[in-house]
Amino acid sequence: GAAIDELTNVYTAGAFAFALFGGYRRGRESWELSDGLYHVAFRAVNADRARRQPSLRALREEWETALAHGTA
């Protein structure tokens, strides 16, 4: 298996968001929050590690930006 690193933590945070706000499903129809927050979480769980946010800090900043723009 792959080493546990920052991108693994990003994935885990995204998966946790889907557990809390999507009933463990990743489809938009199950997501309880805004499209903006959905896209932040969906990016975090991308199978292509290079497409995920590069760090938990970057994930948090994207999440906060989505909240600040009234997309929650």
Q: Positions of the model-derived regions?
A:
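Terminal C-lobe "cap" of eukaryotic-type protein kinase domains
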Residues: 50-71
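Inter-domain helical "communication" segments and dimerization helices
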Residues: 28-29
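Hydrophobic anchor on a C-lobe helix of Hanks-type protein kinase catalytic domains
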Residues: 20-25
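Conserved end of the kinase activation segment
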Residues: 1-7
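Conserved C-terminal C-lobe helix
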Residues: 32-47
